[in-house]
Amino acid sequence: MTTSALTEAEAANELMRLARQIAKHNRLYHAEDSPEITDAEYDALVRRNAELEAAFPHLIRPDSPSAQIGHEIAASPLGKVQHEVRMMSLDNAFTDEEVEEFVARVRRFLALPEDAEVVMTAEDKIDGLSCSLRYENGRLVRAATRGDGQVGEDVTANVAHIPDIPQELKAAGLFDIPAVFEIRGEVYMAKDDFLALNARQAEAGEKIFANPRNGAAGSLRQKDASVTASRPLRFLAHGWGAASEVPAATQFEMMRKIADWGVPVSPLLVRCSSAAEMVAHYRDIGEKRASLPYDIDGVVYKVDRLDWQDRLGFVAKAPRWGIAHKFPAERAETTLDAIDIQVGRTGKLTPVGRLKPVLVGGVTVTNVTLHNRDEIGRLGLRVGDRIVLQRAGDVIPQVVENLTREEPRDPYHFPDHCPECGSEAVAEEGEVDVRCTGGLICPAQRVERLKHFVSRAALDIEGLGEKTIIEFFQLGWLESPADIFRLRKRRSEIVGREGWKDKSVDNLLAAIEAKRQPDAARLLFGLGIRHVGAVTARDLMKRFVTLPALREAARQASSAAREGEPANADGAYDPATVTPDSDTAGAEAGRSDALADLLSIDGVGPVVVEALGDFFHEPHNIAVWEDLLSEVSPPPYVVETKDSAVAGKTIVFTGKLETMSRDEAKAQAEALGARTAGSVSAKTDLVVAGPGAGSKLKQAAALGIDVIDEAAWAEIVRQAG
């Protein structure tokens, strides 16, 4: 379903499902080297998530896949390494038009003329395991996998057995190599080497690897380095991380220098001066793909000028100056064997198609989401139908065609009662999702809410996973989040359970105790308030600092909204909407002020205000809230930022900026600890005005707000370092 056809509720539920699916597949791919889906299927999930987040930015979740890199390193026989410079991933493009838009986006951000040449590098994207090699004074001192981008596994002893990785870089002169330089690239296995390895593994009765990427990952991440030494691993560099200096002005020149130092780089690396050249190189590599000695899944483009890369910076998990142009995937036919219904945290009934196993891109697929009742009706799906699965990159893996819809067959009847608790299942007016009306009497919803509360993006309690939540719930030990913090009283009972020992119980209880002063934004997200997702939870806490302050603002704002209190279209508080002509004027002013305060936060609109109000007006939710806060004490929410003259202030940019784009200016402000707003109000501290500034400049003058020009803003940024 297109994003424009979705309601906010549908989008929120789909984002929740995507976050869980992608997290699962990240774990299988990065941590366990045992993926269940193809790269194209994974890309499709990520792509759909990005589309939904772009259409509904206020629904972005704290556990959003767009902010996650790889997967957190679990317990491992290999040591952990903290990356000095985060190992980022890349955003993806799937069409020529998206490549053109990427180039245009770079121009806009840098405020370049439309006809300005933007040189890019283009190289094949190897499907391997990301690795960072740290050289100090030219000698290899450490190697680490990417992990979650911040912490990876120490594989220094293992890479010593990879012939492509030199223990010492070749220097043309005494000062040719920086004192510190981290070379980053992919550890991979050539196709022929992979086939030979699997033949040896089969002959020895040992594990067969699914594909070269898994073979490379499984071979590198070995406790016994001699196992790695016996595997045919290779390495290709594609960039760098921490560096005491970068002895080049462009990406292309730096990659040539890395090659001169003795580290292999892609032989297909070229410079392109236009989007047309980039796409032409993509097609050329695509034609060579089958004949290349290693697996690739696309082409990577990077802005060539390093000073432009510095200006462009990063968003979430990816650089603005790079993108991966992925190759398309496949379609396949299979049979729909059954339709099962899953009940989610918010009561949504999601139909899941169980399929006759079908091979798509080398992976066997057995399940597919059918989204909702309307989607089943649109496709006329019935058990036994022959269907076409699409695994293209621009949508979620989905059923795109029913080949047998005209054949006589019993129709599928979507349930009108919850399969978990028997409560009536209905779709609210204007929504396509069918939801269980049982609320917290529905065990599926209660369990899902508890799972959500302890999930990685919420409280992230180690050892309290899905199976444990279900086990303790069925025993009656867990009914609400606060019960988690009372499990210490059941220590003796837990120890008596099968699979639990003194040490494992003590580890669990210690992990729970460690969360008694949780991050306030994570706690807010963990409560599962509808429409309060990732950035929204963090932005709410940035503004209100403490949870009680947020609760009071939400109660007042929702009262104002429910009573029809007027507000400006841009969400700014308008003093003219409050008149002191009654005894209740003060209270009304407070409610209006709270509403304006909430609406001034980027991404917070009436739907979020209503959701917060609904939550804090419902007696059961208040009881859960107060019970939880009797067990935990989240400290005031403070965001670490640079010490600057504008930290903590609200800034509005208006008019045309001549040396930077509006996005770049906003990114600078946020890095300095300021928050940006789209409109001027009494809460605005500073206005940065360029040529053509209009009504906002007049508003600032009327309110006595400081106004500076772009040069003064640049000086503030310079002084902050």
UniProtKB/Swiss-Prot annotation:
InterPro entries xref list: BRCT_dom, BRCT_dom_sf, DisA/LigA_HHH, DNA_ligase, DNA_ligase_AS, DNA_ligase_CS, DNAligase_adenylation, DNAligase_N
Top-level enzyme category: ligase
Its EC number(s): 6.5.1.2
Cross-referenced SMART domains: BRCT, LIGANc
Domain BRCT: 641-721
Disordered: annotated span: 556-588
One function term, GO molecular function aspect: metal ion binding
GO cellular component, as recorded: cytosol
Signal peptide as annotated in the record: none
Any GO BP annotation: DNA repair
Active site: 125 (n6-amp-lysine intermediate)
Binding site for NAD(+): 39-43, 89-90, 123, 146, 186, 302, 326
Reactions catalysed according to its record: NAD(+) + (deoxyribonucleotide)n-3'-hydroxyl + 5'-phospho-(deoxyribonucleotide)m = (deoxyribonucleotide)n+m + AMP + beta-nicotinamide D-nucleotide
CDD domains the UniProt entry points to: BRCT_DNA_ligase_like (cd17748), LIGANc (cd00114)
Top-level taxon of origin: Bacteria
Keywords: DNA damage, DNA repair, DNA replication, Ligase, Magnesium, Manganese, Metal-binding, NAD, Zinc
Positions annotated to bind Zn(2+): 418, 421, 436, 442
Cofactor(s) demanded: Mg(2+); Mn(2+)
Job of this protein: DNA ligase that catalyzes the formation of phosphodiester linkages between 5'-phosphoryl and 3'-hydroxyl groups in double-stranded DNA using NAD as a coenzyme and as the energy source for the reaction. It is essential for DNA replication and repair of damaged DNA.
Family membership noted in the UniProt record: Belongs to the NAD-dependent DNA ligase family. LigA subfamily.
HAMAP family named in the record: DNA_ligase_A
Protein name: DNA ligase
The organism of origin for this protein: Novosphingobium aromaticivorans (strain ATCC 700278 / DSM 12444 / CCUG 56034 / CIP 105152 / NBRC 16084 / F199)
